[in-house]
Amino acid sequence: MQPFIAHTGLAVIIDSANVDTDQIIPKQFLSKVTRDGFGIHLFHDWRYLDDAGDQPNPDFNLNKPRYKGASILVSQENFGCGSSREHAPWALADFGLKAIIAPSFADIFYGNSINNGLLPVKLTEAEVEQIMAEVEALPGADVTVDLQALTVTSPSGSVFSFEIAESARHNLLNGLDAIGLTLAHGDAISHYEANLPAWRA
């Protein structure tokens, strides 16, 4: 997992509440167990007019030229609700998104995102609305998410603070997933195992 320190990028708006994991990555694309290759199916039922994915929906923001290359998604409350499929953050990350900004997230999606290096940022509804308005008004303008400083900077330069658990922040800053976190304590684990009584080893 790559460390997340700060990221500046183009933001794309999905101005909907209760975006669920079946909308993020529909169930027919869940047969893979590796993390790659899901980006093409992200928001499939919204991005395409046909089941095969051959006819892009020109009205969906991710298909609009002004949002090409977007790496930050801004949405409304309860993002990532629904089933607990880890494929949802996989699809978002595989598409190239680095951070999701919303007033609230479903708890399981929030944890899955952090575990997969995708930063979920909680701002107030008013702050999210301001960022959306600025992104809409200023095509090509960037948003900055700074995990070190715990701030989001809007296209106009407004700075908003956000909170995240220190353990999650540490893992993201250092690029540590569950395996990486275990390996980081490898010496302590080895020392503990070496000192186990023979009957417990």
Curated annotation (Swiss-Prot):
SUPFAM superfamilies: LeuD/IlvD-like. Disulfide bonds: none annotated. Keywords: Amino-acid biosynthesis, Branched-chain amino acid biosynthesis, Leucine biosynthesis, Lyase. One of its GO terms (biological process) is L-leucine biosynthetic process. The gene is leuD. Heterodimer of LeuC and LeuD. It catalyses: (2R,3S)-3-isopropylmalate = (2S)-2-isopropylmalate. Its EC number is 4.2.1.33. Pfam families: Aconitase_C (PF00694). InterPro entries: 3-IsopropMal_deHydase_ssu, Aconitase/3IPM_dehydase_swvl, AconitaseA/IPMdHydase_ssu_swvl, IPMI_Swivel, LeuD. One of its GO terms (cellular component) is 3-isopropylmalate dehydratase complex. Catalyzes the isomerization between 2-isopropylmalate and 3-isopropylmalate, via the formation of 2-isopropylmaleate. This is 3-isopropylmalate dehydratase small subunit.
